[in-house]
From Swiss-Prot:
Induction: Expressed in both exponential and stationary phase in rich medium (at protein level). Residues 39-43, 92-107, 154-167, 212-216, 260-348, 392-396 are periplasmic. Pathway: Bacterial outer membrane biogenesis; lipopolysaccharide biosynthesis. Changing R215A: Loss of activity. Residues 1-19, 62-71, 126-134, 188-194, 235-240, 368-372, 413-419 are cytoplasmic. Changing R265A: Leads to a reduced O-antigen surface expression. GO terms for molecular function: glycosyltransferase activity. InterPro entries: O-antigen_ligase-rel_domated, WaaL-like. GO terms for biological process: lipopolysaccharide core region biosynthetic process. Activity does not require ATP and magnesium ions. This is O-antigen ligase.
Amino acid sequence: MLTSFKLHSLKPYTLKSSMILEIITYILCFFSMIIAFVDNTFSIKIYNITAIVCLLSLILRGRQENYNIKNLILPLSIFLIGLLDLIWYSAFKVDNSPFRATYHSYLNTAKIFIFGSFIVFLTLTSQLKSKKESVLYTLYSLSFLIAGYAMYINSIHENDRISFGVGTATGAAYSTMLIGIVSGVAILYTKKNHPFLFLLNSCAVLYVLALTQTRATLLLFPIICVAALIAYYNKSPKKFTSSIVLLIAILASIVIIFNKPIQNRYNEALNDLNSYTNANSVTSLGARLAMYEIGLNIFIKSPFSFRSAESRAESMNLLVAEHNRLRGALEFSNVHLHNEIIEAGSLKGLMGIFSTLFLYFSLFYIAYKKRALGLLILTLGIVGIGLSDVIIWARSIPIIIISAIVLLLVINNRNNTIN
């Protein structure tokens, strides 16, 4: 009886502590996302602290009424990817492997996604409601800060593709686009949600993408912008029409300003495709197409099997020995196959493909159930990039993905009470 009374009297304090830790979790998610943009090593440390704070918050909170299957689907899909990556790593990693980098990247993804499943679950079951718009304006400023930083880097290395701190220009482009989506969507949740402010943000993002010269994002991001405008302004034809006209003007301006590098990248793409049709895949696009063909071939031969990075590389070499036109793919045998589905299938078989599709489905499902249009836009970005590259891999971009999901769910909770 006395014990029951003590527990009851302590409950308000534990709940308050849980709420404080939850707020700290979201703040750390914000910093994890930003730091991942420039420093892989430090970002994983901040992310690990975020996960610990999240777990403490969940423990102190106790069971909630909204702990249901609806709110478990997305965390489960994230956890499944992390678990499969961990199983794959444990089954095949050996000392002194020539594919150490590949194994290490999957181990990092496993940790990030397993921890991330708990952070996303905390967010989906959150009872916190805040009407402060200062947070939204802080998020909105991110794209402009990135654009300013990119301008500074470009002034020093004028003719180079900028890469920030994530290793490659392509990685910088993906990171910029994902953070840019969070930044742009944030302004749409404010009272001053005029499409001009969203498009101003889009202009900053497109400027950075043009500096990275990454074709996939330069094609994908305008489509995502149109999808966002349709989702948010479909009931206001005047705003929608004016915003589309302004978006076209922005795109035209970007093309004019960056005409030379864009034209060069376009010509390179045409040359790559021409080379591929002439049995030469040792080009950027040609290597991708060769990887897709090889990856599908490896999967079809053994669709139910997990296979090591060494085994996949051996299969790639055998296929290239038979079909020399696919030799461009060999350069990436110690990286990945530049498509989420094909990469997952080539190493983890049907289970790998299922886990990736389950994640995509879960993101769309939660976006629909929570009426989270921001999450829908982010999901389109994740799926779109996954068609031509692998981003559920390594450290920086997985951290940005999890953090972006969390932050978009947090700001969506301002307007929705659906659980």
